[in-house]
């Protein structure tokens, strides 16, 4: 089957994001990826951390629930203060970058990122925010979900996606 694979997904510098190492180990890898990619986004767009700090920027993320490893579940039981739920994906970004707009995670299955973009556009048009960070994340730790989707004919025959394609 076809999949977009990420190398070194566990390589994360928690100290840069002011996250204790033990807390980072307990966090959903999607949260760590979203933090890293948000930093990349601002950097590639030419914004410094000082320029975006305190800005009226909303964070709108599409996300699917993440499988919890046994290690993360045990750590969360010992340290319930660690923000590990899917709803914290946007909050972590807003907090680290000191963004003052709304932060939300949307789960509408395959349309989560698109729905997030629609919400962000509406907030921009209404003047609720001045800028928006919009994205989507769905990390699958193994191939079981993909195989289930294949068995139920939820994927294309090529086992890859063809968004907005005539196929």
Task: Identify the residue ranges that each predicted region occupies.
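Cys-dependent condensing catalytic cores that perform Claisen condensation/acyl-transfer
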Residues: 1-167
